[in-house]
Amino acid sequence: MNIYNNKKTLFFKLKRNSLKEWQQYTRHKFVISLGEGTLQLSCFKDYLLQDYIFLQKFIKILSLSAYQAKTLEDRNRSVDFIIGIKHELSLHASYCKKFNISKSKLLKTKEKKQNKSYTDYVLSIGVKKSNLELFVALSPCIIGYGEIGHNLSKLKNWKKNKYASWIKMYSSKEYQKIANENIKYLDKLFTKNKKSSYKSLVKIFKKASKLEANFWEMCI
């Protein structure tokens, strides 16, 4: 079964109730042209630079999640994510070298307003809301990239694409496992937080999906 279309999961329900925003994100022209291999290299490089900044802030967000965790299991999960993101940051720097982006260039790049708007929003959720709401805000990123990678890997001749390494990374068994674990974790958090308003979760999911789409847009 396609893990992204399991109708029993909270993720699927949120996606179904945010279909317009979700499709604007996962079917954005940046994603489509990346999958076709027609995305301008300058756009992809800009994305890599901004994504490096995003990943650094992601660590701060997950640190907040670890601090707010009510159980050891939840805290350990957040810590595991932090370790994973730190590893991804080192891989990201190596990956950028393939596109002639130096470490100094990564460190000197200024954050664009669309990037800041996204991370500021997720941080505000982390400060004011529960861990469930925080992970709902993070799910378009964590799970969404898995779905995008999965979908692009189904395209014909994707392996000949100049961005094949990016598609391979997010369609890999390792990343698909991460996405699947997060889908299950959302369900677990939701079960433990029955008092949470579903409408509020949908609102957060929609907003985060819009901000993800804006992230693509800033690189076009």
Enumerate the predicted regions with their spans.
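Basic/polar N-terminal segments that are highly enriched at the extreme N-terminus
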Residues: 1-12, 16
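Short alpha-helical hairpin
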Residues: 15-40, 58, 183-192
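Alpha-helical bundle segments that constitute or directly flank the non-heme di-iron/ferroxidase center
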Residues: 19-24, 39-68, 87, 136-146, ...
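Structured surface interface patches that mediate subunit assembly and partner/cofactor docking
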Residues: 137, 157-169, 181-201
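Long hydrophobic alpha-helical segments typical of transmembrane helices together
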Residues: 188-220
